[in-house]
């Protein structure tokens, strides 16, 4: 199974570099994969040395230049833990020649890590993925197969129009049994989009008047409800710090002050940790 995936992956790399492989090329790739396995060849450049010149030359870009170390390692050092995060914005901005091989590899690692344990796959800023043809098709596939691996798919986007305008909107709508809507004062202006997501005008009004960063509107097969996490000022000082400027400030404080960054960050918010000792946040 791994060899079949590797064969398809190499075929994709060649296609991205304007080499249309025929049966002879694929047979050669498969033979060389077997030979590389038998001889414990792990690096891409060593594997390429086994190939015919036209195949080897097409793959040169993946072992040279500033990105040449991405695929040409002696061993795979990517370790997945019970909580793994990948920053996709930079990868998706690299262009298909680089982004696609990386995505295919990450997809493979994620899927192999799903062995039936309860899992949650979160796609934050999903508009980036919905706008990418390969990622979009992978999302379509995940909707249908991840549940068999006991994995739930969670997609988040700041703009619901990106989801509605996606070519896989029918799949997104039919396969997401639970939807959580953030407060949106402009909801009335795009009521038609909300109605495409199954909401009525009363529900749109609730979203338009909900309190930002405090209330959320949930719809599911079991019913609908406006709810709040009831976070106090201490919890909000951290849970509400999600914008890039705040995250960067926190990282700078941690780098400069170590564990003391917590107190300094709270002071910038007019709060003191001592005031909350022994109390709920």
Task: Give, region by region, the residue ranges found by the protein language model.
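P-loop NTPase motor domains
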Residues: 1-151, 155, 164-167, 203, ...
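C-terminal regions of RecA-like/P-loop NTPase motor modules
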Residues: 160-281
């Amino acid at each position: 199974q791994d060899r079949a995936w590797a064969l398809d992956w190499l075929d994709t790399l060649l296609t991205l570099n304007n080499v249309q492989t025929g049966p002879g090329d694929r047979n050669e790739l498969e033979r060389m994969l077997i030979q590389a396995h038998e001889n414990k060849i792990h690096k891409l450049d060593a594997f390429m040395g086994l190939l015919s010149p036209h195949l080897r030359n097409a793959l040169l870009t993946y072992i040279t230049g500033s990105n040449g170390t991405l695929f040409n390692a002696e061993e795979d050092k990517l370790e997945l833990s019970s909580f793994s995060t990948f920053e996709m914005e930079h990868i998706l901005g690299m262009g298909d020649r680089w982004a696609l091989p990386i995505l295919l590899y990450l997809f493979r690692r994620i899927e192999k890590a799903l062995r039936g344990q309860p899992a949650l796959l979160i796609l934050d800023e999903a508009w980036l993925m919905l706008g990418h043809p390969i990622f979009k098709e992978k999302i379509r596939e995940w909707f249908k197969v991840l549940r068999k691996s006991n994995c739930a798919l969670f997609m988040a986007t700041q703009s619901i129009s990106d989801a509605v305008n996606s070519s896989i909107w029918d799949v997104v709508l039919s396969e997401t049994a639970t939807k959580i809507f953030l407060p949106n004062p402009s909801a009335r202006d795009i009521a038609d989009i909300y109605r495409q997501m199954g909401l009525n005008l009363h529900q749109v009004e609730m979203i338009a008047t909900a309190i930002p960063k405090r209330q959320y509107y949930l719809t599911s097969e079991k019913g609908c409800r406006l709810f709040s996490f009831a976070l106090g000022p201490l919890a909000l000082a951290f849970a509400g710090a999600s914008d890039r400027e705040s995250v960067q400030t926190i990282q700078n404080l941690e780098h400069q002050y170590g564990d003391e960054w917590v107190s300094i960050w709270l002071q910038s918010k007019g709060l003191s940790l001592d005031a909350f000792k022994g109390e709920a946040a």
